[in-house]
Structures are given as structure tokens and as C-alpha cells.
């Protein structure tokens, strides 16, 4: 694969962060793959991997063109720094923990690939409840949103229904292939 943005998408609770972290560990020091850090207008919580920023800081970065990608979901702003565009131009893959709704709104591009992390609905519900981040009403909203966004066109799909190592290896194989 030549330089590209790799958007890893899937419903909340599908294990995107865990699958990405597993693949990252398996790839080691592979210089052709860069894992972008998301910026989110939310405090860091256990199990999340992002750089927190305030809403005014987000708006300032947006106004000066420092964001390559940005979207809104679940009441928060998410963003990827413009600095990663240089990696894509240099022929590297830049892995982004993205949003299904955002990716569906993007125009087709030869340097954009979508990887879908899928998971059975009953596992999603259990994982969302277990992490304790959301109220039961918010969990129900996330599950309903998942039903609305099931038709994501993806270039590759990783099933994360059982063994995390298997899912991580599947993503690592795609990124290194």
C-alpha cells in the first residue's frame, strides 16, 4: 500500500482502541505505519487513548488549519493533527481511530482506506456496561446508533468477537500487507 489514511471505525464498545493497540504492539517499529493520536474535547478516562483539549482550544486549532480531520460524535469534538498529512505524503500509512458517520460523509479518495471493527450486539452491550463510562440510557443510545450505522462500506473488516490477539493480528496483517 502506498501512503494512505487508514480510518479504523466501529461502534462504541467494539474494541477499536484495544485492537489498534494490539496491532501497534505486533508491528513494533515498522516505519511504514504511523498511529495518529486523536484529540478529543473530553478528559482522559481509563481505557481511552487520546490527547484531551478544551473546546476553545479545538476551535482555535480548527481556525488556523491545524486539523487534518475533525468530526463530532456523542457530544464531543474529535480531531487529528495536520502534521500527519506529511506522513501520508511520504508514503506511510497513518492509522486513525475514526468515526463511522464521519467516514461515510467523506468523498472517495485514493489515499483513504476504511477498516471496520465489528462485534456482536450482545458483546457491545456487555462491553459498554462494563466500562462504566455511560448511563444505561446512553448505552441504549449508542446501541441504537450502531443499528443505524451498520451499512459502512469498508475496505477491510476485523471481527473482534473473542480473542483480542486474533483481531489485533488481523489488523496488523492488513497494515503490513
Region spans (language model):
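ATP-dependent small-molecule kinase phosphotransfer cores
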Residues: 38-94, 98-100
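Small-molecule kinase domains that catalyze NTP-dependent phosphoryl transfer to phosphate-bearing small molecules
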Residues: 130-177
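ATP-binding Walker
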Residues: 14
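Hydrophobic anchor at the beta1->P-loop junction of P-loop NTPases
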Residues: 8
Amino acid at each position: 500500500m502506498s501512503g494512505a489514511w487508514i480510518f479504523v471505525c466501529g461502534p462504541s464498545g467494539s474494541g477499536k482502541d484495544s485492537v489498534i493497540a494490539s496491532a501497534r504492539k505486533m508491528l513494533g517499529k515498522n516505519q511504514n505505519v504511523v498511529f495518529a493520536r486523536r484529540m478529543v474535547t473530553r478528559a482522559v478516562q481509563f481505557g481511552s487513548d487520546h490527547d484531551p483539549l478544551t473546546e476553545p482550544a479545538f476551535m482555535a486549532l480548527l481556525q488556523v488549519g491545524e486539523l487534518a480531520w475533525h468530526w463530532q460524535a456523542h457530544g464531543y469534538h474529535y480531531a487529528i493533527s495536520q502534521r500527519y498529512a506529511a506522513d501520508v505524503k511520504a508514503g506511510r500509512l497513518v492509522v486513525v481511530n475514526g468515526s463511522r458517520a464521519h467516514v461515510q460523509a467523506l468523498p472517495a479518495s485514493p489515499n483513504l482506506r476504511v477498516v471496520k471493527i465489528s462485534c456482536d450486539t450482545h458483546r457491545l452491550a456487555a462491553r459498554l456496561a462494563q466500562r462504566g463510562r455511560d448511563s444505561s440510557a446512553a448505552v441504549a443510545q449508542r446501541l441504537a446508533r450502531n443499528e443505524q450505522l451498520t451499512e459502512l462500506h469498508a475496505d477491510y473488516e476485523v471481527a473482534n468477537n473473542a480473542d483480542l490477539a486474533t483481531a489485533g493480528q488481523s489488523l496488523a496483517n492488513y497494515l503490513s500487507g
